[in-house]
Amino acid sequence: MKRIAICPGSFDPITNGHLDIIERAAAIFDEVIVAVLENSSKAPLFDVEERLGLIRDVTTHLPNVSADAFGGLLVEYAAEREAATIVRGLRAVSDFEYELQIASINKKLNENVETLFMMTNSQYSFLSSSIVKEVAKYGASVSELVPEQVEIALRKKYQVSSGQ
C-alpha cells in the first residue's frame, strides 16, 4: 500500500521553508500532495492556479510530489486522496499550539488520518509567506527566502500593482 501524505497550506507564495518541509516529506512518503486551500479567508496575492503553477515549477526535482487545490475540510480531502498523513511544518512554539488544535479536531473528524509535525530548518524559523510579500512589496530581494521562480513572479506581481 502506498504511503500518501498531504502538505496543506495557502502557499501564497511558496517559500524555501515550505519547500524544505515538502522535500523532507518526499523522502519519507511514496507520494506527497501539496494541497492549496481554495477558499481561504485570506485575500491572496496569487490566485489558486498561479500558486499551483509555482509549486509545480519548484518541485519538478521531486517525482513523487504533485500539487492540487481543495476546498472544504482537509480530512475529507485526505480521505478522497487516500492519504493517511497530514504533514505540517512548525517554526516555533506558537505554531504548535494552533497546529495541535487543528490536528485534534482533524483526528476527531477522521481517526484514520494522522498529523505529522516537522520542525522547520532553523534557517527558516522566521520565514512566512506574509513576511516574503512584505519584503518583496518594497522592492527588496527575497532571493534567500523563496525559489527563483517565485522571486520573479513576486517582482512581476508588484510591478503590475504599483503601475511600473
From Swiss-Prot:
Binding site for substrate: S10, K42, L74, R88
Keywords in alphabetical order: ATP-binding, Coenzyme A biosynthesis, Cytoplasm, Magnesium, Nucleotide-binding, Nucleotidyltransferase, Transferase
GO molecular function, one term: ATP binding
Pfam families: CTP_transf_like
Site (Transition state stabilizer): H18
Catalytic activity field: (R)-4'-phosphopantetheine + ATP + H(+) = 3'-dephospho-CoA + diphosphate
Enzyme class: transferase
Protein residues bound to ATP: S10, F11, H18, G89, L90, R91, E99, Y124, S125, F126, L127, S128, S129, S130
Superkingdom of the source species: Bacteria
Pathway connected to this protein: Cofactor biosynthesis; coenzyme A biosynthesis; CoA from (R)-pantothenate: step 4/5
Major localization class: cytoplasm
Keyword Nucleotide-binding: yes
The protein's Enzyme Commission number: 2.7.7.3
Cofactor: Mg(2+)
Role description: Reversibly transfers an adenylyl group from ATP to 4'-phosphopantetheine, yielding dephospho-CoA (dPCoA) and pyrophosphate.
Subunit structure as annotated in this protein's UniProt entry: Homohexamer.
Family note: Belongs to the bacterial CoaD family.
Protein name per the record: Phosphopantetheine adenylyltransferase
Organism: Exiguobacterium sp. (strain ATCC BAA-1283 / AT1b)
Phylogenetic placement of the source organism: Bacteria, Bacillati, Bacillota, Bacilli, Bacillales
